Amino acid sequence: MPNTTKNQVAAADKVRSYAKGVDQAPRKVGLVASLVRGRTVNDALVILAHTPKRAAKPVIKAIESARANAINNHGFDGKTLIISTLSVTTGTRLKRFVPASRGRALPFQKKSSNILVEVTGALKPVKATPATAEKEPTKEESK
């Protein structure tokens, strides 16, 4: 299941997004993540768009997923979102072998990463609805 994204809510004020199985070592992804940790979401996306690292792409996807969850599912204002947590942990390791001389095989591991993004921000103000006038019951309601 490489590059799957799992989304959930931690608390009322934080929204999480996971990107699991990113096919790159966590040490390399962590370097990119440290560039944008603690910044606003919009600033982070601009910085990552101009970062010449392969790891920037999955970090962008995870941040955009967290932003979309916060706006669409939880009613946050997109302009006020801040990355409160951006952590990179080790994912599953694939054990492989590379051929060597004299019929030998040398083992190595393909590393993967899990990215966790938590965003916080202000909720959108709820628009006041106009007072609804008393309406006459319809035929179905009067029965």
Predicted regions and their residues:
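Structured, basic alpha/beta domains of bacterial-type, RNA-associated proteins
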Residues: P2-Q24, K28-L35, R39-P137
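Short acidic DE-rich linear segments
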Residues: P137-K143
